[in-house]
């Protein structure tokens, strides 16, 4: 549960959604222990008769806690759910690992030092986990390519992710929506949205340049939201492109505001060379927002014909896509409709039930 202690981005939101859904499902286990290096935030996980929070100290950096502290301090488990790509290499219990996409393109976007620290543990999990849960076959293939490992197929289980119920269309007069748009500086005009970590593979400079190319043709603003882990000079680039007041970078957005920013957007753009079963794309579609993304296997699988796909993340390509979608009301409405249809087929309830079934099967040997 370490991921729930910090900023709740992708994996933390997956864990949180699964735990909330488990509370609504029949749990075959006598007890579900939430192992954490320090107490979870108050109220994050509602009380449940089978849930028990267990603080396992000392609180040391992530992989050290997972690899050394957990195996030394925790003994009497039937099965461990490791929710984020790695698991304790030496442990007395069975282990189920949730793994996400890690393509060669994604690998190249991370610092070499981080890859050296992380990849051996992920490779071990892929080879030796008692069961591996992934969102799709394409995710599995990209994971194998990025880690240069073959995952035993008999241990693989598929469980697609979903957007949670907080993400939905809202009427223009919604007071919560109006307040959020005012606070983030996008009230009074339509806007294009990007949500996610700012990384090399997501073509943020190219998106800004593309927006400059079309900014005289549309009334929209561009809103970028997400942690700037690479320390890109976004404000400097915005100034260089002459987009002050039209392009806005808001950094990390509190979890409660994210659904509102989606609901108010006129278009969502994720021009990424490597993604998993993209939660941000699902959240945008479920909010009734048309999506532009790259024509890559994982994104094709996630969107299933419900997004406007482009071949690359060059500025001229993205500018053309912006003109196409924003300039064609019929296409815009059709993408909105198809996105809502696609996400209606994906639920956290199904994903949570599948993960519970896998855990029970591994624990009991059935």
Give the role of each language-model region.
Residues 1-366:
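Carbohydrate transferase catalytic cores enriched for Leloir-type hexosyltransferases
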């Amino acid at each position: 549960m370490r991921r729930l202690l910090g900023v709740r981005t992708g994996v933390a939101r997956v864990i949180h959604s699964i735990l909330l859904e488990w509370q609504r499902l029949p749990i075959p286990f006598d007890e579900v222990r939430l192992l954490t290096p320090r107490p979870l935030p108050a109220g994050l996980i509602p009380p449940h008769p089978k849930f028990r929070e267990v603080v396992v100290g000392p609180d040391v950096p992530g992989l050290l806690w997972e690899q050394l502290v957990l195996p030394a301090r925790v003994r009497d488990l039937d099965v461990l759910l490791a929710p984020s790509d790695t698991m304790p290499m030496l442990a007395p219990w069975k282990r189920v690992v949730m793994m996400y996409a890690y393509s060669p393109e994604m690998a190249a976007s991370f610092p070499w030092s981080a890859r050296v620290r992380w990849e051996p543990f992920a490779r071990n999990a892929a080879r030796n986990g008692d069961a591996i849960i992934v969102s799709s076959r394409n995710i599995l293939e990209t994971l194998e390519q990025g880690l240069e490992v073959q995952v035993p197929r008999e241990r693989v289980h598929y469980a697609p992710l979903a957007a949670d119920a907080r993400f939905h269309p809202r009427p223009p007069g919604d007071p919560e929506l109006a307040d959020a748009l005012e606070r983030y500086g996008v009230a009074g005009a339509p806007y294009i949205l990007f949500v996610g970590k700012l990384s090399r593979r997501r073509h943020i400079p190219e998106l800004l340049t593309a927006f400059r190319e079309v900014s005289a043709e549309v009334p929209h603003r561009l809103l970028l939201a997400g942690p700037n882990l690479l320390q890109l000079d976004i404000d400097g680039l915005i100034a260089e492109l002459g987009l002050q007041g039209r392009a806005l970078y808001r950094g990390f957005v509190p979890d409660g505001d994210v659904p509102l920013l989606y609901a108010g957007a006129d278009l969502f753009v994720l021009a990424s060379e490597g993604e998993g079963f993209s939660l941000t794309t699902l959240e945008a579609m479920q909010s009734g927002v048309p999506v532009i993304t790259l024509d890559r296997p994982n994104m094709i699988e996630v969107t299933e014909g419900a997004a406007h796909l482009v071949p690359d993340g060059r500025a001229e390509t993205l500018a053309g896509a912006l003109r196409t979608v924003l300039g064609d009301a019929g296409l815009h409405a059709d993408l909105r409709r198809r996105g809502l249809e696609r996400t209606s087929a994906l639920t956290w309830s199904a994903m949570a039930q599948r993960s519970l079934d896998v855990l029970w099967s591994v624990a009991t040997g059935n």
